[in-house]
Amino acid sequence: APAKEPIPLSQKIAFGVGMLANQMFPAVLGIFMVILVEGLGMSPLLWSLIFFIPKLIDAITDPLMGYISDHTVSRWGKRRPYVFIGAIISGLSFVMMWQLDPNNSIMHNFYYFLAWSCIFWIGMTIFSVPYVAMGYEMSSDFHERTRLMAVAQWIGQWAWVLAPWLWILLYDPNWFESAAEGARFLSLWVGGICMVLALVPAIFCHSNSGAVGEGVHQDNSSLADTLRDFGRGIVITLSNKPFQKICIATFFIFNAFQTIAAFSWFIIVYYMNGGDTAQAGAWPTLFGSVMSLCTCFLVIPVVNGMAQRY
């Protein structure tokens, strides 16, 4: 049974380091994505497809990854191997995704980026689904799990504090001749560092999924049996009323957040400053960074305190 004693602070920090990678990838991706329109001349339609298609695949692979992880039996447990593999795939594919050349045609860059983006989000699925499940298995105590997630979210939120400062590097001619060149170079650092951070929970965190795994291992099950079992699990999960409420809340919160995050740069630069990036200055950076600092020092402590009390 999962341990009821408090999770050691070192384990909470190790888990939180993984959350930093889990948040840093999309935080930097949201900043770099502007380059596809600004620096490489992609149309809004192509830009929308680059957002839509990988996330559509992500929506399909997420529950599938959960099923695979739950049914895995290994000496390393049923979460850590996938966290390890997903971290490597995500880091390497993030680097490859941004090796774009403005001299290539727009459609060449579109298909190149789309292909690597799909691989990246599959890697993120392999990493993030077992990673989050690992966190909930580190303790059976509700309040201890809440404290773990508060620590992890606090550490992870710093991704949104730090990432906006890449705006300044990307558009400073003293650093890079163009934003596209800046993305090619900075992706090496972001992908490499985030890959290392994502490997930390796979190596140092100890969930209670069992040393040899506690997945339901069915040697003689056919593909049809497996698909039926998977479908039955989806139906049972979706019929759960509390889960439905969580899904609805998550849908609206994430859509609101992602919409603002994706369009904030365009609003600040084009609506408020007439398309002049020099005039916009550090405002795109400050907008994202200050909001995230408020989340770190106001929202997360308050929500964690309320969860402990109520």
State the predicted function of each range.
Residues 1-310:
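Membrane-embedded alpha-helical bundles of multi-pass transporters/translocases
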